[in-house]
């Protein structure tokens, strides 16, 4: 038989889709054919999650109000959160979760040919106490791109309450500060540490990204290697390559004693 058959690349569609190319590369990527992001935002109360979400969906330097054809927000707390009042004014909002809401969005999108489907966003904000294990939201986490959902954002105070399906399909991870729950942070570091060279590297990256209250770590898991940012501003790590000295970071709050990190390649920024 000679040489074996070779895998040929699949050609990109001939028509150009430049929607989303205007988005800053430090933000979760939502453009391209079949593109989109499942973004998890994890943080305690009063750590700036509402401000972050308001900026993402209202600030013209981010996605703004004109990026998506439709935005659906489900939030148990939005009616009582003064920070989110402009989101409530701008978008279609329910202060509860229901599978019927998700089902209705899916059925509406299925009315269109794929190329004609509206480009939409769904935000599920602090709903996990009312979202069951078999909820349609979790099923959507592995299929959202089929319905041209370009942004599926899920915010939670408790990482371990987020379905494994959502965690496995997460494209972008944002962790706010301060993060007082030691066990939660260790769980996150165990789950995502390998992509940056281990748990200790992950904790050092988080600490370096969040020196002040309301700072956050953004991990772009769509990139290869994974890119880590301080807020949406500064690239601080790519995979195991850290652009700071991890040995200078005090990790005592996570371990009860300082840990030496010796597995990263460091490079001055």
Spans of features found by a protein language model:
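Short, aromatic/basic amphipathic alpha-helical patches
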Residues: 82-91
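Conserved P-loop NTPase motor cores
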Residues: 39-60, 65-66, 76-80, 95-197
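P-loop NTPase motor core of the ASCE superfamily
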Residues: 27-46, 52, 65-66, 118-119, ...
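Intrinsically disordered, low-structural-confidence terminal and linker regions
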Residues: 1-5, 267-269
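An amphipathic, basic-hydrophobic helix/alpha-beta surface used to engage anionic
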Residues: 71
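Pre-Walker A adenine-sensing motif
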Residues: 10-33
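Short, mixed-charge, low-aromatic patches
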Residues: 6-13, 141-144
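Short, flexible N-terminal segments of the mature chain
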Residues: 94-98, 237-240
């Amino acid at each position: 038989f000679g040489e074996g058959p070779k895998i040929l690349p699949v050609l990109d569609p001939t028509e150009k889709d430049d929607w989303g190319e205007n988005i800053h590369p430090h933000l979760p990527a939502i453009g391209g054919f079949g593109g989109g992001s499942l973004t998890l935002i994890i943080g305690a109360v009063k750590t700036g999650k509402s401000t972050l979400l308001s900026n993402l969906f209202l600030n013209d330097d981010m996605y703004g109000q004109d990026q998506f054809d439709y935005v659906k927000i489900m939030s148990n707390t939005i009616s009582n959160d003064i920070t989110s009042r402009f989101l409530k004014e701008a978008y279609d909002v329910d202060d509860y979760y229901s599978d019927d809401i998700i089902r209705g969005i899916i059925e509406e999108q299925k009315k269109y040919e794929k190329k004609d489907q509206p480009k939409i966003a769904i935000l599920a904000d602090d709903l996990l106490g009312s979202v069951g294990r078999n909820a349609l939201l979790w099923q959507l986490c592995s299929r959202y791109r089929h319905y041209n959902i370009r942004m599926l954002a899920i915010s939670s105070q408790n990482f371990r309450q987020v379905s494994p399906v959502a965690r496995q399909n997460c494209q972008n991870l944002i962790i706010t500060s301060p993060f007082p729950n030691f066990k939660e942070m260790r769980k996150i570091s165990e789950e995502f540490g390998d992509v940056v060279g281990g748990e200790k590297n992950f904790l050092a990256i988080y600490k370096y990204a969040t020196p002040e209250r309301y700072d956050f770590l953004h991990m772009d898991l769509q990139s290869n290697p994974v890119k880590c940012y301080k807020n949406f501003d500064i690239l601080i790590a790519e995979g195991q390559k850290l652009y700071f000295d991890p040995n200078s970071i005090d990790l005592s709050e996570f371990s009860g004693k300082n840990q030496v990190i010796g597995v990263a390649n460091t490079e001055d920024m």
